[in-house]
Amino acid sequence: MPRSDYLFTSESVSEGHPDKVSDRISDTVVDAYLAAMPEARLGVETLTTTNRVVIAGEVRGPDSVTFKDLEELTREAVRDIGYEQSGFHWKNNDVAIHLHAQSADIAQGVDAAGNKDEGAGDQGIMFGYAADETPALMPAPIFYAHKILKDLADARKAKQGDAAKLGPDAKSQVTVRYADGRPVEVTQIVLSTQHLDESLDSADVRAIVEPYILKALPQGWVNEGTVWHVNPTGKFVIGGPDGDAGLTGRKIIVDTYGGAAPHGGGAFSGKDPTKVDRSAAYAARYLAKNVVAAGLARRATIQLSYAIGVAKPLSIYVDLHGTGTVDEAKLEGVLMDALDLSPRGIRTALQLNKPIYARTSAYGHFGREPDADGGFSWEKTDLADKLKSAF
């Protein structure tokens, strides 16, 4: 029997965290190529460190996207995040770009004669998850850990009062108590944030961030028993890539469900949508969210698996965690019929061949609002009625 009374913790990191700066730059490169050629292929990794950005990887795309363009886009991304410090400044960083052509051996596995982009770009397993704990059908701990940091970043960028004294680099962690399987309160809050004013101590920083944290969390979830840890190490002035080197793809649990669901191991950022690490994980979330939105379960985990060069998934697995109203084996068949789970089918259904990825690089790929231009299309619940009618 699953436990119904327990504590569960998830963490998030801000857009200024070194690894997230790297994710942002990698996805900015992806967007640049997809904007020029929707069928572009990319696998882009970024290293960020003191006064330096290194971009490397494989590309199949138009020559119209130049390294000079990518350098300018990189500087714009770093500027948007907010880095103007001596050890990492959008204007002064050295930007080195090492991109080369995609391997012909990989390309032949993905291409099929007369049918471009037919096979999966790699083997792997991908998971999707949804739960009715929040309006976005996300687990509460990761949803609110993201919201805290997003709200603080918005306030910092808008220069709202003392929030302007905060820096781009931050981390949050939220511990939620569950009773009868439902989230009821926050027992621990951890927030570490860079601050530009060296005179600030932990108490000063808490005075700045506490109103935003309280507003981000559901009313009544924070009480006298909630324990706060705000900048517990004290001073946090040197932050971002100047404090720690960053790499693309190192925050895969932050990017997904905060540890509340399994993870297949593949990162998202820097990859075009022929890479099933990304597109199939989005499809699995889309299916899981629609299962919960349809009222077929309160929680749903979906696994997909693929082989390189093979169009159809090798398997699908559904776990409703004892909360379902339908047979899981039958639901697996219904889901296979409801959505073409080939890489091409996923890209077509979710309209993934668009420059929509830089925005996903911080505050979670899931639990976001769908955008009018196709961003976060996998968060739509337009499949719910179809799934419901199948039963």
From Swiss-Prot:
Pathway given in the UniProt record: Amino-acid biosynthesis; S-adenosyl-L-methionine biosynthesis; S-adenosyl-L-methionine from L-methionine: step 1/1
Catalytic activity as recorded in UniProt: L-methionine + ATP + H2O = S-adenosyl-L-methionine + phosphate + diphosphate
Gene Ontology biological process terms, A to Z: one-carbon metabolic process; S-adenosylmethionine biosynthetic process
EC id: 2.5.1.6
EC class (word): transferase
Presence of keyword Cytoplasm: yes
UniProt superkingdom: Bacteria
InterPro entries recorded: ADOMET_SYNTHASE_CS (IPR022631), S-AdoMet_synt_C (IPR022630), S-AdoMet_synt_central (IPR022629), S-AdoMet_synt_N (IPR022628), S-AdoMet_synthetase (IPR002133), S-AdoMet_synthetase_sfam (IPR022636)
Residues noted as binding K(+) in the record, renumbered to the chain: E45
Region named Disordered: 1-20
Chain positions recorded as L-methionine binding sites: E58, Q102, D244, K275
Cellular component, GO, one term: cytoplasm
Residues involved in Mg(2+) binding: D19
Annotated segments matching region Flexible loop: 102-112
Localization in the cell: Cytoplasm
Binding site for ATP: H17, D169, A170, K171, K235, F236, D244, R250, K251, A267, K271
Cofactor dependency: Mg(2+); K(+)
Main localization category: cytoplasm
MF (Gene Ontology): ATP binding; magnesium ion binding; methionine adenosyltransferase activity
Cofactor mode of binding and number, as noted: Binds 2 divalent ions per subunit.
NCBIfam families xrefs: metK
Quaternary structure, from the entry: Homotetramer; dimer of dimers.
Function recorded in the entry: Catalyzes the formation of S-adenosylmethionine (AdoMet) from methionine and ATP. The overall synthetic reaction is composed of two sequential steps, AdoMet formation and the subsequent tripolyphosphate hydrolysis which occurs prior to release of AdoMet from the enzyme.
Protein name: S-adenosylmethionine synthase
Gene name tied to this protein: metK
